[in-house]
Amino acid sequence: MKKSKTYDIVTIAIVAALYVILTMTPGLSAISYGPIQFRVSEMLNFTAFFNKKYIIAVTIGCMISNFLSFTWVDVIVGGLSTLVFLSLGVLLFDRFKEDYFWNGQLNKAFFFFAIFFSISMFTIALELKFVAETPFLLTWGTLALGEFASLFIGAFIMDKLGKRVDLSR
């Protein structure tokens, strides 16, 4: 069966909405913003390894979620950072998608991506340095650790989900 553009738009909208919900839900929103953050929604980055259209979905979800942050600059910087580094990460690590660590428990592509994307938090640390006058290295460190933790946990969840639900459509 051939997919329609409508189907693609709807699935992109659903993933973007899930990102927003997992970021802005009371309780989760308290840990989703600022120099120390743990965004549960970041696990949705891995949907892009199943279908590249989800790069747009996650970027849109990130930008909408960042409207709740303390500055509109975060909408632009966070959105562009997500678009660029998610695209690069999929391009660099997609070839490891079928390889695993720990007897098939941890997808290598997801693990390498988690490290790469955590390092990319320098963009958000720079933003916070200029907008909120936070110390760059400390902020980068806390952002990278939070990002890695959320992606590492999300890697297990999304890999298992991807084996049960066809995320490639």
Curated annotation (Swiss-Prot):
Bilayer topology: Multi-pass membrane protein
Protein's job: Probably a queuosine precursor-binding protein that interacts with the energy-coupling factor (ECF) ABC-transporter complex. Unlike classic ABC transporters this ECF transporter provides the energy necessary to transport a number of different substrates. The substrates themselves are bound by transmembrane, not extracytoplasmic soluble proteins.
Major localization class: membrane
Superkingdom of the source species: Bacteria
Keyword Transport among record annotations: yes
Family, as annotated: Belongs to the vitamin uptake transporter (VUT/ECF) (TC 2.A.88) family.
Protein known as: Queuosine precursor transporter QueT
Subcellular location(s) per record: Cell membrane
Lineage per the UniProt record: Bacteria, Bacillati, Bacillota, Bacilli, Lactobacillales
Segments crossing the lipid bilayer: 9-29, 44-64, 73-93, 110-130, 137-157
InterPro entries to which the protein is assigned, alphabetical: QueT
Complex formation: In E.coli forms a stable energy-coupling factor (ECF) transporter complex composed of 2 membrane-embedded substrate-binding protein (S component), 2 ATP-binding proteins (A and A' components) and 2 transmembrane proteins (T component), probably with a stoichiometry of 2:1:1:2. May be able to interact with more than 1 S component at a time.
Keywords associated with the record: Cell membrane, Membrane, Transmembrane, Transmembrane helix, Transport
Record bears the keyword Transport: yes
Disulfides per UniProt: none
